[in-house]
Amino acid sequence: MLVNLIESVYRLLWGDLFTIPLGGGIGISFMVVLLFTAGIWFTCRTRLLPVRLFRDMIAAVCEKKQGRNGLSSFQTLVISTATRVGMGNLVGVVAAVSAGGAGAVFWMWVTAILGASTSFIESTLAQKYRQPDPLYGGWRGGPAYYLHVLAERRRGKKLKRSVVAALFAVSGLICWCGISQVISNSVSSAFENAFHIPPLTTTLVLTAIAAVIVLRKNATVKSLDVMVPIMAVCYFVITVGIVLFNLPKLPAVFGRIFAEAFGLRQAVAGGFGAVLMNGVKRGLFSNEAGSGSAPCAAAAAECDDPVKMGFLQALGVLIDTVVICSCTAFLMLLVPQEITEGLAGMDLLQTALQYHLGGFGVVFIAATLALFSFSTFLGVLYYARGNVAYLCGDNWWSQTVYKLIALAMLVIGGMQAYTVVWDLGDVGIGLMTIFNMIALVPMAKEALAALNDYEKRKKLQ
């Protein structure tokens, strides 16, 4: 019954909202319309921010911590990158190419470029409306908190909780439980292929190690500080090396991506509509722009200007999808199609790495996925802190209960079917995006005003 409910909500969010009568019918989902419309609108309103202010985005990474509490700019980027560069860049890209073909990669790029401006708006608002965190110290915030501010303004009085803000918080907790399932499902599959270890064994070991880390107070950020830079550099160096070694094949890969992106070559069932939907869906899962996840980390940073935190998160979206997701996609697309035909999920990625690096490739991607999975799991639990506190108040029991639920979802995910696991995460992130947009549309003018003020001050320097 629960599976049927998840599938029904999934179809409502990601199923065809309408069909364009071209090439046998192009199905467009509600979420595709929402994300593209918002992305185009915010990109225009910020006057092509990702291009215009790219240098400022780079400079924001080097901002020094302004106080003793909270996170530095680098730590904030690390936490949001942990979830983006974690499962999204491996499992998300694999899922996009498996279901949408090579053309889905192009639509992931488009989603990221448009999403950078959306990420700027939501992260700037999160920084502006953050609150002190009495449990963990520092700051907390995110869409639940600026949705609460919006509700109080419209009602004209103080509220203990807002319905829409609570719905966002619940959707986020559902999404992050879904991501927990994707983590164990993918890692157990990878370890079974690489080392012939039974999925249940891998899942239980993964859960035990995760429990040791997450049930401690502030171990999450400390673990990510060390883990993310090392794993990201290792993965990036090896994948770029493979791409450079296969440089003569890249023009054909780009040709395939663009041909399948616009339906010039039929690659998957459902044609252009399936390519577009899977690219946007997995692009959102990978870079999180507009979903409201990354602002939960942005709110925790010590920063002298909310605009700089917006720059930081916009940069994270571009690093994630345009750079690292592309590397993962190229790993698979540089392999002859007859070798990967009929493969999906981690089987596809591991076969691709085996083609490029031999037996080492299978072991490398399994180990990398395990590290990425830990970073993602720790990252989403960090996101969950403020949302659990918004729903249940400032107490340790609610924080611990959610951590235990997330750990339980790790166990369940390792034994579930691949598609069912993805559907729960997609439902959660879809609902989060809808509730987040309810706040972003009317409150965007505040972030835009802050941006204009920043640019005026910059001219005077």
Q: Which residues are covered by each model-predicted region?
A:
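Extracellular/periplasmic helix-exit of transmembrane alpha-helices
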Residues: 122-134, 240-256, 270, 300-303, ...
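Transmembrane helix-loop junctions in multi-pass membrane proteins
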Residues: 45-50, 89-93, 175-188, 211-223, ...
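N-terminal alpha-helical transmembrane segments of multi-pass membrane transport
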Residues: 1-87, 97-104, 115, 439-461
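Flexible loop linkers connecting adjacent transmembrane helices
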Residues: 48-73, 95, 101-102, 117-159, ...
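Membrane-interface loop-to-helix entry segments
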Residues: 34-35, 42-58, 164, 172, ...
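Selective recognition of specific alpha-helical transmembrane segments in multi-pass small-molecule
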Residues: 114-122, 202-217, 228-248, 281-284, ...
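Helix-loop-helix module between adjacent transmembrane segments
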Residues: 38-43, 114-139, 148-185, 189-213, ...
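Alpha-helical membrane segments and immediately flanking helix-loop junctions
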Residues: 67-99, 125-128, 135-150, 167-170, ...
